[in-house]
Design a protein with these regions (language model features):
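Residue-level signature of outer-membrane beta-barrel architecture
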Residues: 4-6, 36, 40-42, 131-135
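Acidic/polar N-terminal loop/beta-strand segments that form early-domain functional surfaces
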Residues: 5, 14-16, 134, 146-148, ...
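Outer-envelope beta-barrel architecture signal
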Residues: 7-11, 45-49, 139-143
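Alpha-helical scaffolds flanking conserved acidic
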Residues: 29-31
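Surface-exposed loop/interface segments of Gram-negative outer-membrane beta-barrel transport/assembly proteins
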Residues: 1, 23-24, 33, 37-126, ...
Length: 170
């Protein structure tokens, strides 16, 4: 953060950044934030203005938590990837003798994590202003105005390839 004054107008600017991986391999959050505060005073402090703008952008990738239970129960002697599983991006997958998917079998937990793309992006801006004016002729009498604005926009998507075993049950 940075504080100071320009032509007797005090200000404070702050920026923030976070990029953190989740507990599961594909989970992640990236957050970018910024804020600006202005606090000018005029006419021997009879007019006070406090204004602020805060903004943020949050990008999330949510890991497939089904992979936790599957990892606990999945056969540990099977490889994560193996030859002959091109249809499943090389991930070992339980198949029937005819080569079709065993729909009741556990899905490879790494396949669950790496083929599940669940993301959200949220942008938000909050702006506020307070204007307070003490009347010169009667300083106990004040006019006060508070205004605010809050804007938020979000978008999310979930993508699972059609060939993924978790799509077979749909």
């Amino acid at each position: 953060s940075l504080t100071g004054a320009v032509k007797n107008i005090p200000y404070r600017v702050s920026l923030g950044y976070l990029n953190e991986n989740g507990i599961l391999r594909t989970g992640n959050i990236e957050r970018i934030t910024g804020a600006l505060n202005l606090n000018p005073r005029f006419f021997d402090n009879h007019l006070k203005i406090d204004a602020s703008v805060k903004g943020s952008r949050i990008n999330n990738r949510f890991a497939n938590t089904d992979a936790i239970q599957t990892a606990v129960s999945f056969d540990p002697t099977q490889p994560v990837k193996a030859d002959g599983f091109d249809k499943y991006d090389g991930y070992f997958t339980w198949l029937m003798p005819d080569g079709n998917l065993k729909t009741q079998a556990l899905t490879n937990p790494m396949l669950l994590l790496n083929t599940y793309d669940n993301t959200s992006n949220v942008s938000r801006v909050i702006a506020t202003a307070q204007i307070d004016y003490k009347m010169h002729f009667l300083p106990e009498l004040r006019a006060n105005l508070n205004v605010g604005y809050d804007y938020s926009k979000g978008k999310g998507k979930v993508y699972i390839p059609e060939w993924a075993p978790q799509m077979a049950s749909r």
